[in-house]
Structures are given as structure tokens and as C-alpha cells.
């Protein structure tokens, strides 16, 4: 079952991030979470999600852009289903070059050639002590 997110929780999430990072900040969540966030309204009944077509800008939530990440957890108890912050502070390290191996024998009887590729990567927040990215965690139940 999906856990609900309120408009006030999103406001608190935005303000939990150091103001120095909010200029380039954006949200990140699963597409199912976006569906639920599009239904949220503020105290005046205005939607938090705003389509950008009228102003030729990307769609926003609370005035911030968002990114859909299908690998993020869906809204459920205990899940960290919404991230907010400056993702340019996330560094991706390529541990090694891509290694490609050609396997002539595997599918030879079918007249085909197989390829096998290896690649290693890692990632971490730079200067994580100043909290450039925060997560909204759903209540456990």
C-alpha cells in the first residue's frame, strides 16, 4: 500500500537542504510517486505540480525541476521515495574502462558471435557534510 506524502512534507524537505544548494536543486523520484504528487494541492487548492508548457520551461513541483528515476523506491511505508538537492554534487567514478570480449564459439552453430562487456563504477556525494541532497522517508506504518 502506498504511503501518502503531504505538501507540508515537501516544503520541509526543500528547507532541510542547505540554502547554498537550493539554486540548482531538483527533486528525484519514481514515476508512480510523480503520479501521486501531481494530485497534491496547497492550502489554497492550487496544484504543487505545474506544467511548464505555458512558460516554455520544464514541469516543476514547488517551483523546482524534477527527474524521474525508475530505480527509486515507490511510495510505501519506510521507503525513501523522494530526494531533493543539488545532484551536481554527486560524483560518479569510472573504476575501469569497458572491457569487451568477443566469443566466437558460443553461438557458432547458429552462425552468430557473442559479445560480453564488463564495466565497474562507483559514486558518492562530494562534500556530503553540508548535506547537498536530502531524502523524504515515509513513516514506517
For the regions a protein language model found, what residue spans apply to each?
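Structured, hydrophobic secondary-structure cores that serve as assembly/anchoring elements
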Residues: 1-141
